[in-house]
Swiss-Prot record:
Main location: membrane
GO cellular component, one term: membrane
Annotated protein name in UniProt: Sulfite exporter TauE/SafE family protein 5
Topology in the lipid bilayer: Multi-pass membrane protein
The entry's keywords: Membrane, Transmembrane, Transmembrane helix, Transport
Source species: Arabidopsis thaliana
Chain ranges passing through the membrane: 1-21, 57-77, 78-98, 101-121, 127-147, 150-170, 224-244, 259-279, 315-335, 353-373, 378-398, 409-429
Subcellular location: Membrane
Membership in a protein family: Belongs to the 4-toluene sulfonate uptake permease (TSUP) (TC 2.A.102) family.
Signal sequence annotation: none
Length: 449
């Protein structure tokens, strides 16, 4: 996998260095094709530059975002990796605008998942794990949103393409794994060979469907731990208060602060000790719980973790929040495979990931608003569309998988769309970078204010 990424980056570098030299050698037909594609992309961007108005491109983007939310809702990954290519390629907006829209759409879809997890009668959410992940994830989101304003669009395009390629590879591998498990369970059930025990087969079936259906087979009613949920809200609110004090891009907030002044950066830097304090408290609480009940911890709502894994989680959540803030994706597609590789059960991973995506996506959306995001009315409409699609998707996918017994179909669907998005985003991103370069536009880093 690392080799593929290195080759991918080398190809991008070769393209950037030799593009000017190869331009003269291109056949006339290639010039005409590139010119027509460039004209089409320019016309889309010009129509979306000032204000997004109702058009065929916007309607098509809304339909595709509805389908994307429909597919990704049951997996608990947020869907940001699908929303951004749709907005950039179909609606014609730039990558930064698409990232801000994606934050709103991911928020809308995650609300549907949170409602399903909290009030669906399932004991799957690991609130202790969420308490351990949330502070550093919100810190990463804050830094990521600033990076979105500072980094040039060509660099964001490269980072997003690499990230999406990695996520696509992990998703397809998971799909193959699920397909093999489904086939094995089907063969054993069909031939009536319970050599490994019916209980073990049922357990594998439950684990197989849990990441997508969030373990609909779990029938135990769960009480919502309001204390832990309240602590999570307090953590979110603590970061939110800092954003309110900071104000918008003009420095207008509860208190008047000069944008990018000394007070501005001191206020933002308070998020670092805040995240460290909350993370330390969560680590101490998790360690004390596991020391008090080392034998029956797995039977409780929490997940038993070794010390090295517990220390690794804050760094993982920070990276997920950072990329989520830059791309507006919520971070679910990054943190979900990392949690699975760390030994977290799939059903707990899916439920907890969708819960964390809600917190990170809402924080990204709030920051984009405070930083002067445009076309907010359209973003609200897209968010509501994704909310409805996610609710419908949770119901339809559960029925479809229950009927056909192939939960891996959804994994392959998401992986296929993500792979296609990687190719399209890389192609059109390279074309946009080349267009800006030829036009002599500034392609360097920008000030955060």
């Amino acid at each position: 996998m690392k080799t593929l990424f290195v080759l991918f980056l080398l190809l991008l570098c070769v393209f950037a260095i030799n593009a000017n030299q190869e331009e003269e050698n291109l056949p006339q037909s290639h010039h005409n094709l590139l010119h027509k594609v460039q004209q089409w992309r320019t016309s889309l961007k010009e129509s979306s530059a000032a204000e997004l108005k109702l058009s065929s491109a916007i309607i098509m983007a809304g339909v595709l975002c509805f389908l994307a939310a429909l597919i990704s809702s049951a997996g608990g990954i947020g869907g940001g990796g699908l929303f951004i290519p749709i907005m950039t390629i179909v609606a014609g907006v730039d990558l930064k605008t698409a990232s801000s829209f994606s934050a709103f759409m991911v928020t809308g879809g995650s609300i549907a998942n949170v409602i399903s997890n909290l009030f669906g009668g399932k004991a799957l959410l690991d609130y202790d794990l969420a308490l351990l992940l949330e502070p550093c994830m919100l810190l990463g989101v804050s830094i990521g949103v600033i990076c979105n304003r500072v980094l040039p669009e060509w660099l964001i395009t490269v980072l997003f393409a690499v990230f999406l390629a990695w996520s696509s590879l992990k998703t397809c591998r998971s799909g193959v794994k699920f397909w093999k498990l489904e086939s094995e369970i089907a063969r054993e059930s069909g031939h009536g060979r319970p050599e490994r025990g019916q209980g073990q087969i049922e357990e594998e079936t439950k684990n197989l469907k849990a990441p997508l259906l969030e373990a609909q087979a779990t029938k135990n009613k769960s009480k919502i731990p309001w204390t832990k949920l309240g602590v999570l809200v307090i953590v979110w609110a603590s970061f939110f208060v800092i954003y309110l004090l900071r104000g918008n891009k003009d420095g207008k907030g509860i208190i008047t602060i000069k944008p990018c002044g000394v007070e501005y950066w001191i206020l933002l830097s308070l998020q670092i000790p805040l995240a460290l304090i909350f993370t330390k408290l969560a680590l101490s609480r998790t360690e004390s719980r596991q020391e008090q009940s080392p034998n029956d911890q797995k039977n409780q709502e929490g997940t038993r973790l070794d010390k090295s894994t517990r220390l690794k989680f804050p760094a993982m959540s920070f990276l997920a929040g950072l990329l989520g803030g830059i791309f507006g994706i919520g971070g679910g597609m990054l943190i979900s495979p990392l949690l699975l590789q760390s030994g977290i059960p799939p059903q707990i991973t899916a439920a907890t990931t969708s819960f964390m995506v809600f917190f990170s996506a809402t924080m990204s959306a709030v920051q984009y608003l405070l930083l002067g995001m445009q076309n907010t009315d359209t973003a609200y409409v897209f968010s509501f569309i994704c909310f409805l699609a996610s609710l419908l998707g949770l119901v339809l996918v559960q029925k479809a998988v229950a009927q056909f017994g192939r939960a891996s179909i959804i994994v392959f669907s998401v992986g296929t769309v993500m792979s296609l998005s990687t190719v399209l985003m890389t192609s059109f991103g390279a074309l946009d970078v080349w267009t800006d370069y030829v036009a002599g536009k500034d392609m360097g880093f920008k000030l955060p204010c």
